[in-house]
Regions:
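Active-site-adjacent structural elements in enzyme catalytic cores
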Residues: 1-224
Length: 224
């Protein structure tokens, strides 16, 4: 089955297979997440990523997240979660927790945030707390994603709001019913010189004290 731009399909086994083909061919798919609808593509396809930035009119300095079905997918992307982010991820994912992964030399992502001092690039990741979104990610593989709206506009909580924003400029829309709305994730990176070995870049719904407490549960120190 071929897809014309702007096609909307309910989430079924058939539409998931179609979404996987669109992503593999360098297209854009709008998907429901655990917060809002997002526009997504293959994070290894530069042309598709450029298309998201143009579509959203998003400044290039604003990085895209990479959505995963499991941290097991990090290795295939050439990413590592430095300690203690690996422990925090085990505690808070799936959910509103966005650790900053570090790229290995074999990383093939086109979404990496560059560092000015020659250190390895970095990538914010997330595992959505939604069985439906995880099913999509298992079908498509990891996705580079951003909210399905023009930059500065309201985020889409229904597939129709995403269609109204982008129309036929997106290849396929997956309709997963209304989402709950925007929830800020807590963004954390590893920093061996900072308190507890982490720097909290953005405090979201998971409070800073909850993050830090998790590092010391069961007597676990930074080396645990």
């Amino acid at each position: 089955m071929s897809v014309e731009g702007g096609t909307t399909l309910k989430v079924t086994d058939e539409s998931l297979a179609q979404a996987a083909r669109v992503i593999r061919d360098g297209g854009l798919v709008v998907i429901p997440t655990d917060t809002v609808y997002g526009v997504a593509c293959d994070p290894r396809n530069k042309a598709a990523i450029d298309r998201i930035y143009r579509l959203k009119r998003r400044p290039r300095y604003k990085a895209l997240q990479v959505l995963l079905a499991s941290t097991d997918q990090l290795d295939e992307l050439g990413l590592d979660l430095p300690s203690p982010l690996n422990r925090l991820s085990a505690a808070f994912l799936p959910g509103a927790f966005s650790p900053i992964a570090v790229a290995r030399p074999d990383c093939t992502l086109e979404t990496l945030a560059d560092t000015a001092d020659g250190r390895p690039g970095t990538q914010g990741i997330r595992i959505p707390n939604s069985a439906l979104c995880l099913a999509i990610l298992k079908a498509t593989g990891p996705l580079a994603a951003s909210s399905a709206n023009r930059s500065g506009d309201e985020s889409a909580q229904t597939v129709q709001e995403a269609v109204d924003a982008f129309g036929s400029e997106v290849d396929l829309y997956l309709d997963g019913a209304p989402t709950q709305g925007h929830v800020s994730s807590t963004v954390v990176k590893a920093d061996p010189y900072a308190r507890d070995g982490i720097e909290i870049l953005r405090e979201g719904v998971i409070a800073q004290n909850v993050i830090r407490k998790a590092l010391h549960l069961n007597g676990g120190g930074l080396g645990a």
